[in-house]
A protein has these predicted regions:
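Hydrophobic alpha-helical transmembrane segments of multi-pass membrane proteins
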Residues: 18-24, 50-55, 92-103, 158-165, ...
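Transmembrane alpha-helical insertion/packing segments
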Residues: 13-56, 215
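Membrane-embedded translocation segments of transport machinery
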Residues: 2-14, 176, 180-284
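Hydrophobic alpha-helical transmembrane segments
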Residues: 17-18, 46-47, 153-157, 260
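Inter-helical loop and helix-membrane interface segments of multi-pass membrane transporters/permeases
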Residues: 4-8, 36-40, 70-92, 106-172, ...
Length: 284
């Protein structure tokens, strides 16, 4: 399949690498993975987890890279170039990603607002009551789910504007530069949080509870499904993100080593985050 050249490409392999790490590392690593690890055998979970990395995570990421690199186009266009009558199937993934982005933008809006009020602990003595009552203004009725909260809407709007500006800027000057700043900053913040959490009283209790292995679960099919599911979710496999990013790589890009580094960074981050989460839970 001949490649269609696109002048808009990554300025360096580092930009591509950090952008891919930024797309992989996210809320699933911080919120989801610690729970999955704990509820699926603790330390025993690492066996199916490593197997999932080796036979699904790395190979499928390389596959997405290779296909995206070859077609040098969006996923719908790639499907169209194979068969025009199946082009509509190619739009399912971008639409799915957009739907995910909608609820992610809401969570990011919450996070942005909490960054501001964290300076003076604006949630008061009862954080749960503040979040559901004052912040979301939710109640037990069905109508309470649709309450319009102006400051949350503003926070979401700011997020959408930022994303629009970045996505409508030259790839290297926009997403490339942003990734070079925000991805290292994210890792630096997480390192600080985890190191601090390890100094808290009871941190060892939380870690012992997290990593206490239940070897009997290795015979349970569900733990293996959880490991492979986490790998798909964490690396965003099959969502056309890696496909799209790889379509903007230069001809001499080393896609295999990039896939290895992305997998190592992603899996390392979520395991590091799990240490911080359960250290804090042990303290609580």
């Amino acid at each position: 399949m001949a490649k269609t050249k696109d002048k808009n490409e990554w300025g360096s392999n580092l930009s591509f690498l950090l952008a891919m790490i930024g797309s992989a590392v996210g809320l699933g690593n911080i919120w989801r993975y610690p729970y999955v690890l704990y509820s699926n055998g603790g330390g025993a979970f690492f066996i199916p987890y490593i197997v999932a990395i080796l036979i699904m995570g790395i190979p499928f990421l390389i596959l997405e890279y290779g296909v995206g690199y070859n077609f040098k186009s969006s996923f719908p266009k790639a499907v169209k170039s194979i068969s025009k009558k199946w082009e509509y199937l190619g739009w399912f993934l971008p639409v799915a990603v957009f739907m995910i982005l909608i609820y992610y933008s809401a969570i990011l809006g919450w996070d942005g607002f909490y960054v501001i009020i964290s300076a003076f602990k604006g949630w008061g003595a009862d954080p749960n009551a503040y979040f559901t009552g004052s912040f979301l203004q939710a109640n037990d009725t069905l109508g309470g789910l649709g309450t319009f909260v102006p400051f949350v809407a503003i926070a979401m709007l700011v997020g959408w504007v930022i994303m629009w500006v970045i996505s409508h800027t030259d790839l290297e000057k926009g997403l490339g530069r942003v990734s070079k700043v925000l991805v290292p900053l994210l890792f630096a913040i997480m390192i600080f949080i985890v190191l601090f959490s390890l100094t808290l009283p009871g941190a060892g209790i939380g870690l012992a509870e997290l990593y206490n292995p239940d070897w009997s679960l290795l015979l349970n099919f569900n733990i293996w499904m959880a490991a492979f599911g986490q790998m798909i979710f964490s690396l965003s496999l099959g969502m056309s993100i890696a496909f799209t990013y790889a379509s903007y790589t230069k001809d001499d890009s080393d896609l295999v080593s990039n896939a290895l580094w992305v997998t190592v960074a992603n899996c390392g981050f979520e395991n590091f985050a799990a240490i911080g989460v359960f250290s804090i839970l042990g303290y609580m």
